[in-house]
Curated annotation (Swiss-Prot):
Species, as recorded: Caenorhabditis elegans
Residue intervals passing through the bilayer: 271-291
Function: Potentially involved in docking of synaptic vesicles at presynaptic active zones.
Cytoplasmic side: 1-270
Name assigned to this protein: Putative syntaxin-2
Assigned GO CC terms: endomembrane system; plasma membrane; presynapse; SNARE complex
InterPro entries linked: SNARE (IPR010989), Syntaxin (IPR045242), Syntaxin/epimorphin_CS (IPR006012), Syntaxin_N (IPR006011), T_SNARE_dom (IPR000727)
Length: 299
């Protein structure tokens, strides 16, 4: 009994050894571009969640009587993370556009191309809405902080004029005043420091503008390359269409010639048949006359 069990187990093992797993099927062009679109959708949803969390945290900070400077670092880290992820999301959308162009080259179905073109446009529209949401959230927060700081300066600094308040707001920054990083009442003692800080802020703004311009130029370059390829495809399609029209015109002329030739052949055949029929009739008449004369002579 034990030997039979061992023999059965060995047979089962041998059968499993003979089984070979078939290689995984590579994804099709449609599956690949759909996966890329799904990746972009998930990334947009994730960044939108981070923006909503940033808005809640900003509202929490604005509700505090005295803001903690550590909250500022937390908010700045969140804003920096959102900006980095937004930049990564733009690159991901450009990759999705490239994948869609490859998809259009491999797929002939107009319906599938149009469907995925609409999906791509929707993703780009959602990205623009996401960027606008982030900018509106940040601008709303800065505006509310500025209003609160101006109210605090007007309450605390009885000897400050509107010009002093505006200068403090512009040079020091409303967020710095909000988080107690600058003393609003020491205006004259920090004039030099504020001037240096203002110049430093101008340099940082210039660097940010240069980086933004570089990104804009990269986007324009990408769009130009994509449009150049589209124009080339249109030119090729026009040339192919012209060749097909010429070929069709030649085929039509050939068909007309064939039709004329067939008509001439039919006329010739009909004339021959009529001639043969006339000859047969004449022969029959002659035979009838000859036979009738022969009968008369016999009588």
């Amino acid at each position: 009994m034990r030997d039979r069990l061992n023999e059965f187990q060995s047979r089962v093992t041998d059968r499993f050894d003979e089984v070979e797993l078939s290689p995984a099927r590579p994804p099709s062009a449609a599956e690949y571009v759909d996966r890329r679109f799904e990746e972009v959708r998930n990334a947009i949803a994730s960044v939108r969640g981070e923006i909503e969390k940033l808005r809640r945290d900003q509202q929490h900070v604005l509700a505090l009587t005295i803001a903690d400077p550590r909250d500022k670092n937390i908010l700045e880290n969140q804003i920096g993370t959102i900006r980095r992820r937004t930049g990564d999301l733009r690159k991901l959308v450009r990759q999705a556009e490239d994948d869609f162009l490859e998809f259009t080259k491999q797929v002939q179905s107009v319906t599938e191309k149009r469907m995925r073109q609409n999906q791509l446009e929707l993703l780009k529209d959602n990205l623009n809405k996401l960027i606008n949401l982030f900018n509106e959230t940040h601008q709303d927060y800065k505006s509310r902080v500025s209003v609160r700081v101006r109210r605090q300066l007007q309450t605390v600094g009885q000897d400050l004029t509107d010009e002093d308040i505006n200068r403090i707001m512009e040079n020091s920054g409303s967020e710095q005043l909000f988080f107690r990083e600058v003393n609003p009442l020491s205006v004259s003692g920090q004039a030099a420091y504020e001037d240096v800080k203002k110049r430093h802020g101008e340099i940082k703004d210039l660097e940010n503008n240069i980086a933004m311009l570089e990104e804009i130029f990269l986007d324009l370059q990408h769009l130009t390359e994509a449009q150049d390829e589209m124009v080339t495809n249109i030119d090729n399609n026009v040339e192919n269409g012209l060749e097909q029209v010429k070929q069709g015109s030649a085929n039509v002329k050939t068909a007309v010639e064939y039709k004329k030739s067939a008509m001439r052949k039919k006329i010739c055949v009909a004339a021959i048949l009529i001639t043969i029929l006339l000859i047969l009739i004449i022969v029959a008449i002659i035979l009838a006359v000859v036979l009738s004369r022969g009968n008369n002579n016999n009588k």
